A protein has these predicted regions:
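Generic N-terminal amphipathic, Lys/Arg-enriched alpha-helix
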Residues: 1-23
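Flexible, glycine/charged-enriched surface loops at secondary-structure junctions
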Residues: 24-32, 47-49
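Active-site cofactor/substrate anionic-group-binding motifs, chiefly glycine-
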Residues: 48-102
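Glycine-rich beta-alpha loop segments
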Residues: 94-107, 114, 120
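Conserved small/polar residues in nucleotide/adenosyl-binding loops
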Residues: 158-159
Length: 159
């Protein structure tokens, strides 16, 4: 199979524009989404790169991913956050979650954050590296919408 080389910056700009214009993402949401997807491909994680665009588009068209939604903090302590995603795209929600988590961890020595009701956030390693870049340990996990239909079921529920 022949490989195609695409300029990183051009692909990132194209993807950002596609999310902004095609899927009505706000500029900042489109920017982080494009950045993480293209970075996944650049690192060899094609399963979490730009090939996922059709999945994110289908979620928007089905109303499962709401680009204009705003996440909100619903519970907060010095070492814990719960963020209600309100079906916002996972990438901008994760950026906010990691920024707040790392600020609290620097102040208090640790922090755990839970994001609920958001969408897939791409390559988990990207988010965990945010902690490593600041000399901390970070774990990043996500769930996603159902991807497979179990036997005798009428809807996708297995991820």
């Amino acid at each position: 199979m022949e490989r195609t080389t695409v300029d990183y910056g051009k692909l990132r700009r194209y993807m950002q524009r596609m999310f902004e214009v095609g899927l009505k993402y706000p500029e900042e949401s489109a920017e982080i989404t494009a950045k993480v997807l293209v970075e996944a491909d650049a690192r060899g994680h094609a399963s979490h790169g730009v090939a996922r665009v059709s999945m994110y588009a289908a979620e928007v068209w089905d109303g499962k991913n709401v680009p204009q939604a705003k996440p909100e903090i619903v519970h907060e302590t010095p070492v814990y956050l719960v963020i209600q995603g309100n079906r916002a795209p996972g990438f901008p929600v994760s950026r906010t979650a990691m920024e707040r988590t790392l600020e609290k961890a620097e102040e208090n020595g640790t922090c755990m954050t839970v994001v609920r009701d958001s969408c897939h956030f791409g390559m988990a390693g990207y988010w965990a590296e945010q902690a490593a870049d600041r000399g901390m340990i970070g774990w990043a996990f996500t769930n996603t919408l159902g991807a497979a239909i179990p036997l005798y079921s009428d809807r996708k529920s297995v991820v």
